[in-house]
């Protein structure tokens, strides 16, 4: 089944889970798309089975809190940042609920975490104005970059380069093998003082970069030239909430939730709005991702909603 405008318009909420007492701050699909794991401000980690559409397990990180949860490549392991006490990144085995390793180094809250799509490398960005490069096998930081402001960062789909958005006004591209030589490309964007960048994501084909903000718009950037291709707006975000935006796996569409529980969908190429879907969420949709392998996506406030198309195209 192929994603088309009509298929996207047909998506409806199939199941809603109310496992959390506070907002879900992050979730991540396993590479196979078979499970999704969430982190919440209520200090819980909930694992869902996407094929059966039900929660499987709940774990807790009461002491440190949990945010920015990410699957690693090993089965049943995740990394996540803390939102209490310290700013250490933790590597957890879900199998026996034990920490495998800690990654200390950041002195302020971690605001970005990206796992390499190809190996055990990951990067983190923090309010301490640094990006750190890590290897899951070592607690020691493998590389450190000092920046001029708050960073957002992400690997490209090949895992060869990573992009850093700095101070909500420039995007720097680094070669992973020689990042200490500085960026090989820098794209300066128009600075908008009304909001700041909250995330940066590559499309699966590596051609596009999506800049999320805590304002009422998103920017779609050409990953090679740095030109802004489209600015998407027209969704509600009056309280400057961090709303997650996402590409569909075919790199053809962009989706974002809003503070009023609706999901807005645009065509990447034309820039046209394709659909507005009502998720009936009780709060702002802080998390939204399309499943990497199956025709389903998930949105979250303090509830998790699983969506399915209602037509066979």
Curated annotation (Swiss-Prot):
Pfam families given for it? WD40
Enumerate the WD repeat regions by residue range.
19-58, 105-144, 146-184, 192-231, 236-276, 280-313
InterPro entries xref list: G-protein_beta_WD-40_rep (IPR020472), Swd2/WDR82 (IPR037867), WD40/YVTN_repeat-like_dom_sf (IPR015943), WD40_repeat_dom_sf (IPR036322), WD40_rpt (IPR001680)
Keywords, A to Z, come to: Chromosome, Cytoplasm, Nucleus, Repeat, Transcription, Transcription regulation, Transcription termination, WD repeat
UniProt record, GO biological process: DNA-templated transcription termination; lncRNA catabolic process; negative regulation of DNA-templated transcription, elongation; negative regulation of lncRNA transcription; nuclear RNA surveillance; positive regulation of transcription elongation by RNA polymerase II; RNA polymerase II promoter clearance
Classification via Gene3D superfamilies: YVTN repeat-like/Quinoprotein amine dehydrogenase
- Which subcellular locations apply to this protein? Nucleus; Chromosome; Cytoplasm
What's the domain of life for this entry?
Eukaryota
Chief location: nucleus
- GO cellular component entries: chromosome; nucleus; PTW/PP1 phosphatase complex
Query: Partners and quaternary state?
Result: Component of the SET1/COMPASS complex. Component of the PNUTS-PP1 phosphatase complex.
Q: Would you identify the family this protein belongs to, as annotated?
A: Belongs to the WD repeat SWD2 family.
Job of this protein: Regulatory component of the SET1/COMPASS complex implicated in the tethering of this complex to transcriptional start sites of active genes. Facilitates histone H3 'Lys-4' methylation (H3K4me) via recruitment of the SETD1A or SETD1B to the 'Ser-5' phosphorylated C-terminal domain (CTD) of RNA polymerase II large subunit (POLR2A). Component of the PNUTS-PP1 protein phosphatase complex, a protein phosphatase 1 (PP1) complex that promotes RNA polymerase II transcription pause-release, allowing transcription elongation.
Name of protein: WD repeat-containing protein 82
* Source organism: Xenopus tropicalis
In the UniProt record, what gene is named as encoding this protein? wdr82
């Amino acid at each position: 089944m192929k994603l088309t405008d009509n298929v996207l318009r047909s998506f409806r909420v199939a199941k809603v889970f109310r496992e959390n007492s506070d907002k879900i701050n992050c979730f991540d699909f396993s590479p196979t798309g078979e499970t999704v794991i969430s982190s919440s401000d209520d200090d819980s980690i909930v694992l869902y089975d996407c094929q059966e559409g039900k929660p499987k397990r709940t774990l807790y990180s009461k002491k440190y809190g949990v945010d920015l949860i990410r699957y690693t490549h090993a089965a049943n392991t995740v990394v996540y940042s803390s939102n209490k006490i310290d700013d250490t990144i933790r590597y957890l085995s879900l199998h026996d609920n034990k920490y495998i390793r800690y990654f200390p180094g950041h002195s302020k809250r971690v605001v970005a975490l990206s796992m390499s799509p190809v190996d055990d490398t990951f990067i983190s960005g923090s309010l301490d104005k640094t990006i750190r490069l890590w290897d899951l096998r070592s607690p020691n930081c493998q590389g450190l970059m000092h920046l001029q402001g708050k960073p957002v960062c992400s690997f490209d789909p090949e895992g060869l380069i990573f992009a850093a958005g700095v101070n909500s006004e420039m995007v720097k591209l680094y070669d992973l093998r020689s990042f200490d030589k500085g960026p090989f490309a820098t794209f300066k964007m128009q600075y908008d003082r009304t909001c700041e960048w909250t995330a940066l994501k590559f499309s699966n084909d590596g051609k596009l970069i999506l800049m999320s903000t805590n304002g009422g718009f998103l920017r779609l950037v050409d990953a090679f030239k740095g030109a802004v291709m489209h600015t998407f707006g027209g969704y509600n975000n009056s309280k400057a909430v961090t709303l997650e935006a996402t590409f569909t796996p075919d790199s053809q569409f962009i989706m974002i939730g809003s503070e009023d529980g609706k999901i807005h969908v645009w065509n990447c190429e034309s820039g046209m709005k394709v659909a507005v879907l009502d998720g009936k969420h009780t709060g702002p949709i802080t998390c939204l991702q399309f499943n990497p392998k199956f025709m389903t996506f998930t949105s979250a406030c303090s509830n998790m909603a699983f969506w399915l198309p209602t037509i066979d195209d």
